[in-house]
């Protein structure tokens, strides 16, 4: 997705290219469905994704574990009532927000507020809906988007609440227009992995790239 191609892969590719300048790397931006199809056809060697792909078809290597976070516009008055649940940005960067010292916010308190969701076919969108369901409410969805960063940018503008992964939050500049909250553990943790087609030739370049990244 353009999330990874914009915020994660450029630095990984740059570091690898500086060590192996003779290896040519092409970066393709597509959604998960299209990338998976390209991988299965052998058009691309590797993809990086937060969706779990079929282990009977694809091999994988863990890049990082990611946690979803609730992002709420700072302008929403409910924030003044929930200061003890708010996550400082430095904790997000250090990934300490899953510690017991950071309380889980009672998500149902946001049930009457507007949400910016990713579509249900997106892993983030599916997980967000399950988290709300487990908190016994149906979110008031005013917009369905395709990309995390688009939803987050709309959240920054003050329009609605969104769910976003901590990997991207650790890479983008801190924004004072957003307040962050820890979510219930169930459904909010996922593995971001590199995938390649099982049984396909696994080149030395692919091996070195994965060793460099993971």
Language-model segments: residues:
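Secondary-structure junction motif
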Residues: 78-80, 86-135, 202-204, 210
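Hydrophobic hinge/microswitch elements
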Residues: 31, 35, 40-43, 50, ...
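Residues at or immediately flanking beta-strands
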Residues: 20-26, 138-142, 191-193
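Alpha-helical segments flanking ligand/cofactor-binding loops in enzyme cores
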Residues: 36-37, 61, 108, 152-153, ...
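N-terminal winged-helix
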Residues: 1-20, 24-37, 203-204
């Amino acid at each position: 997705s353009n999330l990874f191609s914009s915020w994660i892969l450029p630095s990984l590719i740059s570091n690898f290219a500086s060590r192996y300048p003779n290896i040519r790397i092409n970066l393709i931006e597509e959604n998960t469905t299209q990338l998976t199809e390209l991988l299965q056809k052998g058009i691309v060697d590797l993809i990086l994704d937060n969706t779990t792909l079929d282990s009977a078809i694809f091999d994988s290597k863990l890049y990082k574990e990611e946690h979803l976070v609730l992002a709420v516009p700072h302008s929403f008055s409910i924030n003044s009532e929930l200061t003890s649940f708010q996550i400082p940005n430095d904790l997000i960067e250090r990934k300490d927000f899953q510690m017991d010292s950071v309380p889980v916010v009672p998500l149902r308190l946001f049930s009457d507020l507007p949400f910016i969701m990713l579509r249900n076919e997106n892993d983030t969108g599916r997980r967000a809906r399950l988290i709300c369901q487990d908190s016994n409410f149906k979110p008031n969805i005013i917009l369905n988007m395709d990309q995390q960063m688009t939803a987050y940018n709309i959240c920054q503008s003050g329009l609605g609440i969104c769910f976003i992964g901590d990997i991207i939050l650790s890479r983008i500049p801190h924004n004072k227009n957003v307040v962050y909250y820890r979510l219930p553990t169930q459904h909010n943790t996922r593995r971001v992995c590199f995938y390649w087609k099982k049984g396909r030739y696994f080149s030395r370049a692919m091996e070195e790239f994965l060793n460099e990244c993971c």
